[in-house]
């Protein structure tokens, strides 16, 4: 036995055997073959490939099992690194390759079952197989080579070399894959032998210490850098924030001071006495007493404390800066009070007459004024009068002590009493002032009161109109009750005018003059009786409206004669004779008759027909119909019928008609002995009305019928074009049947309650995109076709929409190193979110964080300042991920560091800080007092050094400031670095000596601006001993006592706060004696003056100061400085009758004495008072006044205008006068009036007043510029200047007035928004303040307005409609005129009520100008104009002639207007549209390329530049073809095409599915579609799957039509296959009755049956096989047939037909083979495969018959 034979035996045994060393497997192990070879082995110099598959089934009786999931399962079954499925591939062109692989896996034994007979049989087979393999191995290692002898058969041996290498015939051993070694490639091998730096364990390197990597080639870093750095060549490069050899130490963010601290775990540990981030900050004094924080070695105190060490109390609210704070207590400034000086103090303490609230006095009852010093009037006179010394002087209309009572008009005329200003009139009186007589009960509001008597309104009467009157006073036939007549008996009606009928005619008639006219059917005087019809004709009596007839008469009115026996109820009685009903006869219709005498097809028995066989019905006239018609089966194109019939029938007529409109009725007949049939060639999805008639002796029965609809087909080829988050786009294959719409349904399989989304699509749509879906949801998509409101079966597919990414990503709370990223969760259900961030445009620098699905924010840290970052978020679920959603943000600027104070003065502070990391432009310093106040800010440039300095100036002394420094760059600003710093205290101000004595000095000074605690006073004694005195902060003076006289002293005064001191204020002074003054006296007192005298030390004083103070504080203080030598003074210019206090003090060098005082009262003088102005006119007014009687000799009155533009007027009046009328003044002028009395030549104090003369009216009103809606009004202004003019205008006929106000300098204005054609009354009034002049008036009439909004509409070539908005004013008529180029003007007049006018007889394509204006009497409005162009008129008489199947001739007559061309449009019923533009001279056009049997619509339009005429239209139908769109070559041939060549066919007769094919019209009657031709070898047929699906080659030479085309063509119906073969003059053919190719889902499965011919049935071997190419192997052989034979076909194992093989290659199975004609070793010269419909001959015969 040869080697190959042994191999074949081994393969057979291996297919049955199962390794049993470790037990028996429970499940079937199957490995799919991937590649292989054919059974014939080559010569010894050629390559060989062995590749085998085991199909091993366990015996049914085995009860053993192996737990493949446990540790002793799979791990023991597979080799150490065996993949889950063994896949062996070899290259396409590996011609010198040998592969022989044999492998058996033996699992461990799972249970003891070796004694089972079937297991023993397997073990024996396995032993035999191992023997064969061993002998084979011995032969292959003997040096004689391997597998040298050719052999045939099937190889089913398992691959050798453990599936990890290839068997080599040269070395007769395994060539292992990388990573494996050993004779059977079963030992793992480590990469690069671990570079001798480690051990190889199970194929993986276990590296020695110090090395790492897959092959131990890399140096390892200490502790792997603790995941805090990168390892580079064995050295750790630490990440930011870490240091050390192994990156284990955290570095401090700010380097620690080397002198004051050290870095421990990333934080500075400071030495005692220092603090801060870098230990550079010294601690504060007393640790701020625990009442503040230490900043820059100074305490920033908590609220309520202050001082250097926060040891001092702060006053409440810092006394609001309204007082001084001494140890927590406020000493308030004048005008303020309260614990915190927060309350305003009231003037003079409200003089004890009220209480102080918020700085204002709330006075006690009876007092008023800012300080409650004034007496108050009762109830403040109710604001209706003036309060004079506690008494009310009431305004006009008010009276009473407090002006609280209203004064009544006319004193109620003496006929009533006054109550609250209104008259309560006496009985019988009314009116505002009770002056009118009153009517009884005020006429009840139903009449007018005239001189105390009521004049009643219509419908009322009585002395007080309280009674209702009746109409016509009831005509004296009734009485009037509450305005309604109650009629006497016998009368009725609203006014009792009508006579009444008896019983009101019982509601059955009308009452006319007291008599009843009864309705039809009623009688009697009161219409109460029923009347009989025609009064029973006198042949009966009337009883209750019904006639009781006499014998021999009948009827409702007894008008008919009676028939015998009443015709037995079987006939009609006509004039006493019976007219019998059908079926009855005789005088009384008592006998029965048969209908139609049984039509001679039966016998009449007792009135019933006994019908002959086959007939039925009452008269035997009907053929017995079939019964129980049922539909037994329905398909897309057929309906099976069955029925019953027991009667004799000649034949049956089957008639079927579509139920839709215009359905064509069709019929056929079947023999009478047949009770079933099949209706064929029906249209799918159409409802048919089917009737079956029985035919007997050429007579039809009534039909039995049924309605049935043929089934709709299922759509095909539904696939997904695109799948997105919220949309899915699908496409599918078209169908060749007629139907209405596609219906596509989307259903969410995750949320059934959401319902379905249904969309209907029109043909020929084959794609659809559904939006609005939910992300990450599983959807079922079903596709149906709909026809006649019926939905066909659906094609379903399932898909899942993509996950949506998180949305609305936002970076919040962004600082210089952190950012909070927030987002909206995705709509889809997800497992988690992947967040990635890094510096933008730096791709490698990215950090990724995995988050849970519930999170919607994440805080990012350790960012760089002022850096743009990019964040992306991706949703993940299992292996699905969304598109990334991205957002960018920029970190903020970092704050300055180590901010500190360098120095300060009392008004400045100098700062220094370290610059931040970000490159800031400037630094912004904001500062404000900690105690409160406005903040200020400055900006300083950034220093190029590491630190920046700045000085704040203009500060308040001794004030602690809160200071913040932030970095600024553009519009960005960092967080501030903050510090508190205080300015120095300022020294006391104006330090001086105010009083010198021999042993004392009085010191004065002003308080410093700063807040401080105390003063320290220092001076030295003449002995040199220093003296120090501490003074309270509220001190502003101090007396030094115990001094030595005549000594000079230097005195220093310092303000202090805590340990802080101001610079000292300095003064020098000497002690001396003090002069004196005294004996101040008053003499020579007059009303306006008095004299003073006093004594004083001679020569001691430089000056004296005299102060005169009004004791009531009403007058200003008067101060006089006189020489120190004077001892008297005369004081004049005083107010008479006033109390004065006089103060006198002396001023000596360096000393001011204490003042001495005295009192004095000036004498009173006579008064003139109460000067009043009244009765102002334009040229004057009246004056009145009061004066003491008998005191004055005369009065002097002075009058002058306040602007002093005229000479003053002075009038001397008699002593007795108290009033004077002043005239001759200017109008509207303000005058000053002064009046004083003359007594004994002396003037009294004058009284004064201000008076204004009244305004004059405007004059001479005129009008100009009058339009339809506006006019200009002018006037002459009055003499006096006024503030404004008010112009009022209103239509004369009435309406709302309009008002315009203009400036007082204007003399005219424009009145707008007037109504056209209306007369207006216009008034002008001058206004000044609240004063108005008398009006000046005039009238004007506005112009007539014209129509507006002129437009044209409904424009045709000869007509147009003019429309306009009417004039606002009523007009008599409108005048219309229109003209065009070369068209004379036409004028028409229409009524003023018209708003449109039809323009006719226009010229086409002509521009017209249209004008219109309104007329009213002599008035004409303005004219409005518009232009329009008439349409181009259409071509005429468009007709289609010479119509053929593909051509037609269109002719027409030109329009009247000139044209530049014609647009010709013709459209078929399927919507195909074509347009042609022809020249202006053309009047006919020949159409070509039309489709046969097609209805066309042709339209033509004339063109003239931009103008287009209306379309003229005609329709025509081309001459028909049998098949306008042939679906294959047979239909093309039936259309009359008989020449072989290229043709266009239409799949499913669908014009949209064109396909070019080669038709063979000669072979076997023609009609063949050729889909394969081999003739010369020019075309390469060794192609991939894609090429064979699409097709390739030249249709006139060698080609392959394509699998897609074949599938669609054969899906149209049943086709037959013909194969024509030729070789050197020999021919053969093969014909198969049934041939089809499946779709791509079946991999184009072949179905071929019904052989006949001369070539032999070689195709039967390939029936049911899918198509194979070298890149898509579907054959059943152990090899890749397409790869082996360099072709493609429906291979099995492998072929009997290989028409796509190598042309001219006679090698075994390599050439163009047809096995049953030339065998496998001969390549045929010519071969064609072609197809046509199986019923072609029937179709051809039908065509010939037609």
Swiss-Prot record:
Submaxillary glands and brain. CDD domains: EGF_CA (cd00054), FN3 (cd00063), FReD (cd00087). The modification Phosphothreonine is found at residue 905. GO terms for cellular component: extracellular space; perisynaptic extracellular matrix. It comes from the Eukaryota. Gene3D superfamilies: 2.20.25.10, Gamma Fibrinogen, chain A, domain 1 (3.90.215.10), Immunoglobulins (2.60.40.10), Laminin (2.10.25.10). PANTHER family: TENASCIN (PTHR46708:SF1). Homohexamer; disulfide-linked. A homotrimer may be formed in the triple coiled-coil region and may be stabilized by disulfide rings at both ends. Two of such half-hexabrachions may be disulfide linked within the central globule. Interacts with CSPG4. Interacts (via the 3rd fibronectin type-III domain) with integrin ITGA9:ITGB1. Belongs to the tenascin family. This is Tenascin. It comes from Sus scrofa. The gene is TNC.
């Amino acid at each position: 036995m040869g080697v190959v034979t042994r191999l074949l035996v081994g393969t057979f045994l291996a297919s049955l055997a199962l390794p049993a060393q470790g037990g028996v497997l429970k499940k079937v192990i199957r490995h799919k073959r991937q590649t292989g070879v054919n059974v014939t082995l080559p010569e010894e110099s050629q390559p060989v490939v062995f590749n085998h598959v085991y199909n091993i089934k366990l015996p049914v009786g085995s009860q053993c099992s192996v737990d493949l999931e446990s540790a002793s399962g799979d791990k023991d079954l597979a080799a150490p690194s065996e993949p889950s499925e063994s896949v062996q591939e070899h290259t396409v062109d590996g011609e010198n390759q040998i592969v022989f692989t044999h492998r058996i896996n033996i699992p461990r034994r799972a249970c003891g079952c070796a004694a089972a007979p079937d297991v023993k049989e397997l073990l024996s087979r396995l032993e035999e197989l191992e023997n064969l393999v061993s002998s084979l191995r011995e032969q292959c290692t003997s040096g004689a080579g391997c597998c040298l002898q050719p052999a045939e058969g099937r190889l089913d041996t398992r691959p050798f070399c453990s599936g990890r290498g290839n068997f080599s015939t040269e070395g007769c051993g395994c060539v292992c894959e990388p990573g494996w070694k050993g004779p059977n490639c079963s030992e793992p091998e480590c990469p690069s032998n671990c570079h001798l730096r480690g051990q190889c364990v199970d194929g993986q390197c276990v590296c020695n210490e110090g090395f790492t990597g897959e092959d131990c080639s890399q140096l390892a870093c200490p502790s792997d850098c603790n995941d805090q750095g990168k390892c580079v060549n064995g050295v750790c490069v630490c990440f930011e924030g870490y240091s050390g050899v192994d990156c284990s130490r955290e570095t401090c963010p700010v380097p620690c001071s080397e002198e004051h601290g050290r870095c421990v775990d990333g934080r500075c540990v400071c030495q005692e006495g220092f603090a801060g981030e870098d230990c550079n900050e010294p601690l504060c004094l007393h640790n701020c007493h625990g009442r503040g924080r230490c900043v820059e070695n100074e305490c920033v105190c908590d609220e309520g404390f202050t001082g250097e060490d926060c040891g001092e109390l702060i006053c409440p609210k810092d006394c609001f800066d309204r007082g001084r704070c001494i140890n927590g207590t406020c000493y308030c400034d004048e005008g303020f009070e309260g614990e915190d000086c927060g309350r305003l103090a009231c003037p003079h303490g409200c003089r004890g007459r009220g209480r102080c609230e918020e700085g204002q006095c709330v006075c006690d009852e009876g007092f008023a004024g800012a300080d409650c010093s004034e007496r108050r009037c009762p109830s403040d006179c109710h604001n209706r009068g003036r309060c004079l010394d506690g008494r009310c002087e009431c305004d006009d209309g008010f009276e009473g002590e407090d002006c609280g009572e209203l004064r009544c008009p006319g004193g109620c005329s003496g006929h009533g009493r006054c109550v609250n200003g209104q008259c309560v009139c006496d009985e019988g009186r009314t009116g505002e002032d009770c002056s009118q007589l009153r009517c009884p009960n005020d006429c009840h509001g139903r009449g007018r009161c005239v001189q105390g008597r009521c004049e009643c309104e219509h419908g009322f009467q009585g002395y007080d109109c309280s009674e209702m009157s009746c109409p016509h006073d009831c005509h004296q036939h009734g009485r009037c009750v509450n305005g309604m007549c109650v009629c006497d008996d016998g009368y009725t009606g609203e006014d009792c005018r009508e006579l009444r009928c008896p019983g009101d005619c019982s509601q059955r008639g009308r009452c006319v003059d007291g008599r009843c006219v009864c309705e039809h059917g009623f009688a009697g005087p009161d219409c109460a009786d029923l009347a009989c019809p025609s009064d029973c004709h006198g042949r009966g009596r009337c009883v209750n409206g019904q006639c009781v007839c006499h014998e021999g008469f009948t009827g409702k009115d007894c008008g008919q004669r009676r028939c015998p026996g009443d015709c037995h109820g079987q006939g009609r009685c006509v004039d006493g004779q019976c007219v019998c009903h059908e079926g009855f006869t005789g005088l009384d219709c008592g006998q029965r008759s048969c209908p139609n005498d049984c039509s001679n097809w039966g016998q009449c028995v007792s009135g019933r027909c006994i019908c002959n066989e086959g007939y039925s019905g009452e008269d035997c006239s009907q053929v017995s119909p079939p019964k129980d018609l049922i539909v037994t089966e329905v398909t897309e194109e057929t309906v099976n019928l069955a029925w019953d019939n027991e009667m004799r029938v000649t034949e049956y007529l089957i008639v079927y008609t579509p139920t839709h409109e215009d359905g064509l009725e069709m019929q056929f007949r079947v023999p009478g002995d047949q009770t079933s049939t099949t209706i064929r060639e029906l249209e799918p999805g159409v409802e048919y009305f089917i009737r079956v008639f029985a035919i007997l002796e050429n007579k039809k029965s009534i039909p039995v019928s049924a309605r049935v609809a043929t089934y709709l087909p299922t759509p095909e080829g539904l696939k997904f074009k695109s799948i997105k988050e919220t949309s899915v786009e699908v496409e599918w294959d078209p169908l060749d049947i007629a139907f209405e719409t596609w219906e596509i349904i989307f259903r969410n399989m995750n949320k059934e309650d959401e319902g379905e989304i249904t969309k209907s699509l029109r043909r020929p749509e084959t794609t659809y995109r559904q939006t609005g879906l939910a992300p990450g949801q599983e959807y079922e998509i079903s596709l149906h076709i709909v026809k006649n409101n019926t939905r066909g079966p659906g094609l379903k597919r399932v898909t899942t929409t993509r996950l949506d990414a998180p949305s609305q990503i936002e970076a919040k709370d962004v600082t210089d190193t952190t950012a909070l990223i927030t987002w909206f969760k995705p709509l889809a259900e997800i497992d988690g979110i992947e967040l990635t961030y890094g510096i933008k445009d730096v791709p490698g620098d990215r950090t990724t964080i995995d988050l849970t699905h519930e999170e919607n924010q994440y805080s990012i840290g350790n960012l760089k300042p002022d850096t743009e970052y990019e964040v992306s978020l991706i949703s993940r679920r299992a292996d699905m991920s969304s598109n990334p959603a991205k957002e960018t943000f920029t970190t903020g600027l970092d704050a300055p560091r180590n901010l500190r104070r360098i120095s300060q003065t009392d008004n400045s502070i100098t700062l220094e800080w370290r610059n931040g990391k970000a490159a800031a432009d400037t630094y912004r310093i904001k500062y404000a007092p900690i105690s409160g106040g406005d903040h200020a800010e400055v900006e300083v440039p950034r220093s190029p050094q590491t630190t920046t300095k700045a000085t704040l100036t203009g500060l308040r002394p001794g004030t602690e400031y809160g200071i913040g420094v932030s970095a600024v760059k553009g519009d960005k600003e960092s967080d501030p670095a903050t510090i508190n710093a205080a300015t120095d205290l300022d020294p006391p101000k104006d330090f001086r000596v105010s009083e010198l004595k021999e042993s004392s000095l009085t010191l004065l000074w002003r308080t410093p601006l700063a807040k401080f605690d105390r003063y320290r006073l220092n001076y030295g004694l003449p002995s040199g001993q220093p003296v120090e005195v501490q003074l309270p902060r509220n001190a502003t003076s101090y007396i030094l006592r115990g001094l030595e006289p005549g000594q000079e002293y230097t005195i220093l005064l310092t303000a202090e706060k805590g340990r802080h001191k101001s610079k000292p204020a300095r003064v020098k002074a000497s002690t001396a004696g003090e002069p004196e003054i005294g004996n101040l006296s008053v003499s020579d007192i007059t009303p306006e003056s008095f004299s003073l005298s006093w004594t004083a030390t001679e020569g001691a004083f430089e000056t004296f100061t005299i102060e005169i103070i009004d004791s009531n504080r009403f007058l200003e203080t008067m101060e006089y400085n006189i020489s120190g030598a004077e001892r008297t003074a005369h004081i004049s210019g005083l107010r008479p009758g006033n109390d004065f206090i006089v103060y006198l003090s002396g001023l000596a060098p360096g000393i001011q004495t204490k003042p001495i005082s005295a009192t004095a009262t000036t004498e009173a003088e006579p008064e003139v008072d109460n000067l009043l102005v009244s009765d102002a006119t334009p040229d004057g007014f009246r004056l009145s006044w009061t004066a003491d009687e008998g005191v004055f000799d005369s009065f002097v009155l002075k009058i002058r205008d306040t602007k002093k533009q005229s000479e003053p007027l002075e009038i001397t009046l008699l002593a007795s006068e108290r009033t004077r009328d002043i005239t001759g003044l200017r109008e509207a002028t303000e005058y000053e009036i002064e009046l004083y009395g003359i007594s004994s030549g002396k003037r009294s104090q004058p009284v004064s007043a201000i008076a204004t003369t009244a305004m004059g009216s405007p004059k001479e009103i005129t009008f100009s510029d009058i339009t339809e809606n506006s006019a200009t009004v002018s006037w002459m202004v009055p003499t006096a200047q006024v503030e404004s003019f008010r112009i009022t205008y209103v239509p004369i006929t009435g309406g709302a007035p309009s008002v315009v106000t203009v400036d007082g300098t204007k003399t005219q204005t424009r009145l707008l928004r007037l109504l056209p054609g209306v007369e207006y009354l216009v008034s002008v009034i001058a206004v000044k303040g609240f004063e108005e002049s008398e009006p000046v008036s005039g009238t004007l009439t506005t112009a007539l307005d014209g129509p507006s909004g002129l437009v044209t509409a409904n424009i045709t070539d000869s007509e147009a409609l003019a429309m306009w908005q009417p004039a606002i004013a009523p007009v008599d008529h409108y005048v219309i005129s229109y003209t065009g180029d070369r068209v004379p003007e036409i004028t028409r007049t229409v009524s003023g009520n018209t708003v449109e006018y039809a323009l006719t007889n226009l010229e086409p394509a002509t521009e017209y100008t249209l004008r219109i204006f309104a007329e009213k009497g002599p008035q004409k409005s303005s004219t409005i104009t518009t232009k329009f162009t008439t349409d181009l008129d259409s071509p005429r008489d468009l007709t289609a002639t010479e119509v053929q199947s593909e051509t037609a001739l269109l002719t027409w007559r030109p329009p009247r207007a000139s044209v530049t061309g014609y647009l010709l449009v013709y459209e078929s019923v399927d919507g195909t549209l074509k347009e042609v533009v022809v020249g202006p001279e053309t009047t006919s056009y020949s159409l070509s390329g039309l489709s046969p049997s097609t209805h066309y619509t042709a339209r033509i339009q004339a063109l003239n530049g931009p103008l287009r005429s209306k379309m003229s239209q005609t329709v025509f139908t081309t001459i028909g073809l049998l098949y306008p769109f042939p679906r294959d070559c047979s239909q093309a041939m039936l259309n009359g095409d008989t020449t072989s060549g290229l043709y266009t066919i239409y799949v499913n007769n669908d014009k949209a599915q064109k396909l070019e094919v080669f038709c063979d019209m000669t072979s076997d009657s023609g009609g063949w579609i050729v889909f394969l031709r081999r003739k010369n070898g020019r075309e390469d047929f060794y192609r991939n799957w894609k090429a064979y699906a699409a097709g390739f080659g030249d249709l006139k030479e060698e080609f392959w039509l394509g699998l897609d085309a074949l599938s669609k063509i054969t899906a149209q119906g049943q086709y037959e296959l013909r194969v024509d073969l030729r070789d050197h003059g020999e021919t053969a053919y093969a014909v198969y009755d049934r041939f089809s190719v499946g779709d791509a889902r079946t991999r184009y499965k072949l179905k071929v049956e019904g052989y006949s011919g001369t070539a032999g049935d070689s195709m039967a071997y390939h029936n049911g096989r899918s198509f194979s190419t070298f890149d898509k192997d579907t054959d059943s052989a152990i090899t890749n047939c397409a790869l082996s034979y360099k072709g493609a076909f429906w291979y099995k194992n492998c072929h009997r037909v290989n028409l796509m093989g190598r042309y001219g290659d006679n090698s075994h199975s390599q050439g163009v083979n047809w096995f049953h004609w030339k065998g496998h070793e001969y390549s045929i010269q010519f071969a064609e495969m072609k197809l046509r419909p199986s019923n072609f001959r029937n179709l051809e015969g039908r065509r010939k018959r037609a």
